[in-house]
Amino acid sequence: MNNEIAEQIKGMLVERLRIPADELEYDSELFGEDIGLDSIDSIEIIVGIENLFGVDLSGAAREDFRSIETLTAYVEAHKEG
């Protein structure tokens, strides 16, 4: 896992969704009991990642949004350059 990308994603989640940084681990379930985000929050995540990394998330599966780790893996696999 690319820690730089993971930290950028974590920072974006903290900023956009106002999640306390100390509650957000790389493997925290974003849409489960850990953090409890909803479908509106997923839109914020999509916009944030697309703007931050220039990655198109339209082909992403639900599993790609499970945690910072899975989001990082998706960005690594689809980022140009």
Q: Residue ranges of each PLM-predicted region?
A:
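Phosphopantetheine-dependent thiolation modules in NRPS/PKS and related acyl-activating systems
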Residues: 2-36, 45-47, 51-81
